[in-house]
Amino acid sequence: MISDFAESCAYLMNNLERQDMRSVPIINAGAGSDEHPTQALLDMYTILRTFDFDQTADKQSSFVELQKTYSELTRGPANKTYLFCGDIGRGRTVRSLTTVLSQYENVRVVFVSPEHETLRLGDDLRRRLHQAGVAVYEFHSLDAELDGKPLLQQVDCFYMTRIQLEYGSSDEKGEIESMDLSPFHLTKQRVDLLKPYVPIMHPFPRDSVIQEIPPEIDSDPRVMYFRQARNGMWARAALLIHMFGAADDLFMLYDEFYGD
């Protein structure tokens, strides 16, 4: 009874057109297969830190050295090609993150998914990205080519998502489980095609059966999904501090305990 009442209150409050009419703030921490804004926050924090290149994944390559090989490389999320692989149609993290990325200039987004109507890019997200001026590409294998070269050699960020079998009917689940998903596995051979600075991301959890990213990849210095998980704590803590207007208090406490 309490659960039903709480859910009804949250629904009614979320549908108030004016935010100032809501008695308490509401955080969308993941809405089924629709959106996942807080994941997008931590993903963007990870991307911003990575493309600042002060703490690059390849610690033996400085930004200047990278530019000698990749002359068009710039700092920040702009001017980048982002690849999203896996369950694109139902991947809520994909929807939210690409929406944020669309705010940056000269962004290309590549979607790689099985040719199944529930897994491939939906018309709504495609339309949203096109309206934002984002160049969108769709492929059905990680071994595809872009600009006449292997696709994986052309991307600046790799974002994997698991196939979300919990959504859809039992018939759909059976169809997907019977598919050959090997073209969407990030194998060691495919990782070797990536540029040395490309962050490898995953929102977690991984599928231990399908193994879209096998554990053997975890030791690669470009892997960022463990850092993503850690960044989630900081991003969500920052969101709570912002919503409660506690930033000034936090800075005061920081100065008190850590200041000179």
PLM regions with names:
Residues 1-54, 207, 213:
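Phosphate/diphosphate ligand-binding glycine-rich loop within oxidoreductases
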Residues 2-8, 92, 116-122, 208-209:
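Short, charged/polar "capping" segments at the starts of alpha-helices
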Residues 20, 76-77, 102-106, 189-197, ...:
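Short, conserved loop/helix-junction motifs that constitute active-site signature segments
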Residues 25-29, 36, 84, 201, ...:
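General beta-strand structural signal in soluble alpha/beta enzymes
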Residues 50-161:
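Glycine-rich phosphate/diphosphate-binding loop of Rossmann-like nucleotide-binding domains
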Residues 130-216, 222:
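Rossmann-like adenosine-cofactor binding region
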Residues 194-260:
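Adenosine-phosphate binding glycine-rich loop
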